[in-house]
Amino acid sequence: MQTNELLDKIFRGARSQNGWLPTPVPDSKLRELYDLMKFGPTSVNCSPARLVFVRTEEGREKLRPALAPGNVEKTMAAPVVAIVGYDTRFYEQLPDLFPHNPAVKAWFEGDEKVDFANTTAFRNGTLQGGYLIAAARALGLDCGPMSGFNNQAIDQAFFAGTSIRSNFICGLGHGDPEKVFARSPRLSFEQACQLA
C-alpha cells in the first residue's frame, strides 16, 4: 500500500461510525489489533491501557445501563465495543517493562505520588487509546469512539475491585456507510498551531 493510501485509510478517509454492518470481528483480529497497538510509545514504557473487548450479549447487557441514551442503539449494534481503561497501579509492571532502570517503580509508588501516578496512567492510557484507533483502521476495521457514558457505572460493572478506571469506549467492526454523518470541519493549521 502506498503512503497516501495508508494515510487515507487511517486518517483522511476514515470516519467515526454511527452504525454497523452485522459482520463479526474474530478474536484473532482483536489479538492482532492489540499486538500492533502495544508498540506505540508511552512514558518509561508504562503501558497503562487495559482493554475489555465486549462482544457477547452478556457483556453488552452489562454495558447498556452505563450508556447515554443517544449512544445505546449504535453501541449495542457494534460487533465489538472496546472499553479503553487505564491501570492506576501500572507501575507494578515497570520492573518487567522498563528493566534497565530498577528504580523506576519508586517514581510512582506511595501516597504522596498518587496524583502523579494517576496523571501518568490517564495520559499514557489515552495515548494508547489513540494507537488502538489507528491500528484498528490500519487493519481494516472501522471505529466509533465515544465518551457518552457513565464512567462510574462502567468501572463498577467491569473493573470493580481493581485499580483500573475507564477512559472511553470505541465500537469496532465494519461501519454502515449509510449512517455516517457528513464530515464536520476541522481547525486550520493557523487556528490550532503556533510556531515558536
Swiss-Prot record:
Q: Which InterPro entries match?
A: Nitroreductase (IPR029479), Nitroreductase-like (IPR000415), Nitroreductase_HadB/RutE (IPR050461), RutE-like (IPR023936)
Q: Keyword Amino-acid biosynthesis on this protein?
A: no
Broad EC category: oxidoreductase
GO terms (molecular function) for this protein are: oxidoreductase activity
Q: Which Gene3D superfamilies match?
A: NADH Oxidase (3.40.109.10)
Q: Does the keyword NAD apply?
A: yes
Keywords for this protein: Flavoprotein, FMN, NAD, NADP, Oxidoreductase
Q: What is its EC number?
A: 1.-.-.-
Source species, domain of life: Bacteria
- Which cofactors, by name? FMN
Query: What NCBIfam families does the database record attribute to this sequence?
Result: PRK05365.1
* Similarity comment: Belongs to the nitroreductase family. HadB/RutE subfamily.
Q: Protein name, please?
A: Putative NADH dehydrogenase/NAD(P)H nitroreductase Reut_A1586
